[in-house]
From Swiss-Prot:
Classification lineage: Bacteria, Bacillati, Actinomycetota, Actinomycetes, Kitasatosporales
UniProt GO cellular component terms: cytoplasm
Cofactors (names): FAD
Induction: Expressed from 2 promoters, 1 of which (trxBp1) is under control of SigR, and further transiently induced (about 50-fold) by the thiol-oxidizing agent diamide. Part of the trxB-trxA operon.
Entry's localization field: Cytoplasm
Keyword annotations: Cytoplasm, Disulfide bond, FAD, Flavoprotein, NADP, Oxidoreductase, Redox-active center
Keyword match Chloroplast: no
Stated family: Belongs to the class-II pyridine nucleotide-disulfide oxidoreductase family.
Protein name: Thioredoxin reductase
Length: 322
């Protein structure tokens, strides 16, 4: 079992690395569990990022994360590319167990485990990620200028993605497995009014086609079983997100969608000394810049909490021998 640290950060990405930077600069010596596979977060799977302030010519997602990581490390953050398999956040001293079974202890924990896009679950889906398949229109839409694109989904996110993509695309086809949309009336009307957007109803994706890049989709009508081909070079999947909160169920309060609940505008959770930031608490914006902002907030919230603990320790009278 390790010595008690000031703060452990579970997760990386813009939120985790920003929290690490701020706590490190406050001389709190944070320990960061970046994740064995997901170190760097969702931006590790993107290409050029053009909407993060400070990079007028854009920056590749992995490079941005490497820069953030190096900056946090420069100020003394300890970064471990490992996963956390168990936590106990109930006591004054929190415990975090890594994949080797080592138990790490800390006075405060910042949760930045993020969320993951729901996938179609098709064999070629991951292989063509970044090669025509995407889960983020605002991240990748510009790269599909004058191309035929498909958007999968029927909710507000799918309509937002389709409307945004229509600025660049030659055409946008929304594929939905029902004959009505779940999106709000305003979002539906906006999509229906867009001359570049068309709909394929009662259908699902049966196959993502292509070798080195996306070549098209094979669709299946869910009522008749009939198969059809949809020739597109861009596929945007917008069927929702799943927050990575499985580890915290039964300890931290979650909202009905599974996202971590915080006492906004702060980042405090229902447990003293535990803070949440980034996409794990955000099912509205899900942008790198907003994640970084809440990572900063979590660090700033943790600092006075830890300072108060330190003051309490100093105030305790020394025990005299009898």
């Amino acid at each position: 079992m390790s010595d008690v640290r000031n703060v452990i950060i579970i997760g990386s990405g813009p939120a985790g690395y920003t929290a690490a930077l701020y706590t490190a600069r406050a001389s709190l010596k944070p320990l960061v569990f970046e994740g064995a596979v997901t170190a760097g977060g969702a931006l590790m799977n993107t290409t050029e990022v053009e909407n993060f302030p400070g990079f007028q010519d854009g920056i590749m997602g992995p490079e941005l994360m490497d820069n953030m990581r190096a900056q946090a490390e420069r100020f003394g953050a300890e970064l471990i590319p490992d996963d956390v398999v168990a936590v106990d956040l109930s006591g004054e001293i929190k415990t975090v167990t890594d994949t080797a079974g080592t138990v790490h202890r800390a006075k405060a924990v910042i949760v930045t485990t993020g969320s993951q896009h729901r996938k179609l679950g098709l064999p070629n889906e991951d292989a063509l990620s970044g090669r025509g398949v995407s889960w983020c229109a605002t991240c990748d839409g510009f790269f599909f200028k004058d191309q035929d694109i498909a958007v999968i989904g029927g909710g507000d996110t799918a309509m937002e993605e389709a409307t945004f993509l229509s600025r660049f695309a030659k055409s946008v086809t929304i594929v939905h497995r029902r004959d009505t949309l779940r999106a709000s009336k305003a979002m539906q009307e906006r999509a229906f009014a867009d001359p570049k957007i068309s709909f394929v109803w009662d259908s699902e994706v049966a196959e993502v086609q292509g070798d080195q890049k996306l070549a098209g989709l094979k669709l299946r009508n869910v009522k008749t079983g009939e198969l059809s081909d949809l020739p597109v070079t861009g596929l945007f999947i917008a069927i929702g997100h799943d927050p990575r909160t499985e580890l915290f169920k039964g300890q931290l309060d979650l909202d009905p969608e599974g996202y971590l609940k915080v006492d906004a505008p702060s980042t405090r959770t229902n447990l003293t000394g535990v803070f949440g930031a980034g996409d794990v608490v955000d099912h509205t914006y899900r942008q790198a810049i907003t994640a970084a902002g809440t990572g900063c907030s979590a660090a700033v919230d943790a600092e006075p909490f830890l300072a108060a603990l330190s003051d309490e320790d100093k105030a305790e009278p020394e025990k005299t021998a009898v």
